[in-house]
């Protein structure tokens, strides 16, 4: 996955081929498997930003998060329906079943307070929409975010969730092209 126009990739993070591992060290209570995958991918991108020193961001209050996931918390919603029908549900499952939890968990765990959005659509269809939103949040005269974690989440054939996070920042301005010929002097005369 590449950066949208006007943006640069500052870091990448992803779950491993067997699903999330790193995120399970964060105390979050009952969570949907998609939440674990997103939390893991965002944590990996943050670690890359910090040079492997652990998740850190200077000012998370202006960091936006966009997650694209077709399923979101569907697994927990289905489990909640089954448990409710049998009379043995846990109130914690209601929190874990909210689709916004997929985005909100990473925001809470890592202190990210910029704009956030969950696009419930297949990643291949949602990526262009998410990329355009990230570009708009990062650009213009009054940017809404200093960085955007753009996360694509999907279910692997083995059943676990995989997520990839691109940590996007505004692209640096183009360097000014020198129009002056280095073989000419300031006054336009040929140098010897």
Regions found by a protein language model. Name each.
Residues 1-192:
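Conserved "HGTGT" condensation-loop signature of ketosynthase/thiolase-family condensing enzymes
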């Amino acid at each position: 996955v590449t950066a949208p126009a006007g943006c640069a990739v500052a870091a990448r993070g992803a779950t491993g081929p067997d699903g999330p591992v790193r995120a399970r060290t964060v105390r979050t209570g009952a969570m949907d498997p998609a939440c674990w995958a997103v939390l893991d991918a965002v944590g990996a991108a943050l670690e890359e930003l910090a040079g492997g020193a652990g998740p850190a961001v200077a000012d998370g209050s202006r960091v936006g998060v966009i997650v694209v996931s077709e399923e979101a918390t569907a697994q927990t919603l289905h489990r909640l329906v089954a448990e409710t029908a049998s009379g043995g549900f846990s109130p914690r499952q209601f929190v874990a079943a909210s689709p916004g939890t997929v985005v909100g968990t990473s925001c809470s765990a890592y202190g990210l307070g910029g704009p956030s959005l969950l696009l419930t659509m297949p990643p291949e269809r949602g990526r262009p929409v998410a990329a355009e939103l990230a570009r708009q949040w990062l650009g213009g005269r009054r940017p809404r975010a200093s960085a955007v974690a753009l996360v694509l989440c999907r279910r692997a054939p083995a059943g676990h969730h995989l997520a990839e996070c691109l940590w996007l920042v505004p692209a640096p301005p183009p360097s000014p092209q020198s129009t002056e010929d280095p073989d000419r002097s300031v006054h336009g005369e040929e140098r010897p």
